Amino acid sequence: MTLFRSGIILAFLTFIARIFGLVREQFIASLFGSTPMGDSMNIAFKLPNLFRRIFAEGALSSVFIPIYNEKMLISKKAANNFSGKVFTLLSLTLIVIIALMQIFMPQLILCIAPGFYAKKEKFELTVFLCRITIPYLIFVSLTALLGGILNSVKKFAAFAFSPIILSVCVIIFTLIFGNYIESTISISVSLIIAGILQVVFMFICVKKADLHFPIIFHTNDPDVKKLLINMGPATISSGVQQLNLFISQSISSFIEGAISILAYADRIYQFPLSIIGTSFSTILLPEMSKVYKSNDIVSAQKIQNNAIRIGLLLSLPATFGIIILSHPITNIIYERGVFTPQDTTNTAEAISAFALGLPAFILAKILTPIFYANGDTKTPLKITLFSIIINTNMNLLLMDSLKHIGIAVGTSIAAWYNLGLLYSYSTKQHKLHIEAGIKLFCAKILLCCTLMSIIIALIKHYYLEYLYSEYLLIKVSMLGSTIIIGVAIFFGTAYLLKVVNYDNSTK
């Protein structure tokens, strides 16, 4: 299966999962809006996922997959034994980490959201909810490991589907038990139930793929030692990346309602980021690992350039579209219950600011696996350390004048700086070879985006009353029609300019 086709299949499954995620966020936003309770709930929801990105999806996956592929070249049994050792070690490590976090949760929340400390009830509620949700870390991390195993053998569907379980659990559990216990507690408990179901589901998929492995505790194994040594820089790198979020969150905790606003905005701009960037990044790492192991440089360069072209082709129009339509999108998705029109405006502003960095976020997800596929975990760490300095300074500089928008703008500026460093280091180290035609390719896409934006802006201007109709069906139909017309204009123009060739997917 080609990179593009694999990416499209995974992107489609990610799209479905993100739709369910949006429904879940819509449900939570209608209950809490940007109230203090909403801020506490968003922190409790984010905390385990933040550490998951550091330990599981960040450091572990980037180091585990290349070694697992090496073992698979020897035999399936060798790969399964390696998986068993890593699974056991990860489980025991996470149990210790969760126990420590339960003890030091007040101190942890003080670091993540120092602005809450002056508001005793808000601070105590956040600590209480985080103590309920943090055990989800072990389940979601094991799910990520099992997903990495399946991704290594090009079985991407199960892991892409697993987030749907979380969204469905949160909604159903809260609807059933919301009348008997506090909504904040029912949502927090539903996270743990979802985590258990996700692990069970992934285990079933791994067994069906005949990749079942024994539970082995063996820290002296040379492959496990290699994993742990390589995980050092990778964990720091992933941790530093997440530290960007910690810092942004810490700063925003001093602005009432900003944590909730940024969380709701994050959910919408993460929609294309996950569908495009994460989907292709997930596929790229195992693909790149294999071609580098076989020393096939020509294939590696072809994969790199195809991925960059696809990333540009999809991220640039998404950026233009999101910026123009951020307000009606937010209105349709969130504005109900306690979520006010002012919340809609604030969230839309944050979405537009985040969207400015969308191409950089997506292209970074395409370039970063190039280093990990070569076994280089130190360069991404250096790049991330530089980026975090930019992110922190931008957030502090822009927060006073632009409030929550300043934090989102600072994040986008840091994303472009990060991409610039990734490009610079990868080309200097001869790991990336950009084809000469990509500059013209990018210019043509920008021309297509400009024409698309003009058409969308005109539709928005002349049919504004329908985009904000009191009837949901009319609003959704109008927004959907506008997006479809915009997509048709973009790809139609792209075809005329020979940006895309529908026989080969990308030219």
Curated annotation (Swiss-Prot):
Q: Which GO terms describe its biological process?
A: cell wall organization; lipid translocation; peptidoglycan biosynthetic process; regulation of cell shape
Superkingdom as given in the UniProt entry: Bacteria
> Cell membrane: is it a keyword of this entry?
yes
User: What topology does the record note for this protein and the membrane?
Assistant: Multi-pass membrane protein
What are the record keywords, sorted?
A: Cell inner membrane, Cell membrane, Cell shape, Cell wall biogenesis/degradation, Membrane, Peptidoglycan synthesis, Transmembrane, Transmembrane helix, Transport
The job of this chain, per UniProt, is described as:
Involved in peptidoglycan biosynthesis. Transports lipid-linked peptidoglycan precursors from the inner to the outer leaflet of the cytoplasmic membrane.
Q: Which NCBIfam families match?
A: murJ_mviN
Please state what the protein is called: Probable lipid II flippase MurJ
Q: From which organism does this entry originate?
A: Rickettsia prowazekii (strain Madrid E)
The lineage is: Bacteria, Pseudomonadati, Pseudomonadota, Alphaproteobacteria, Rickettsiales
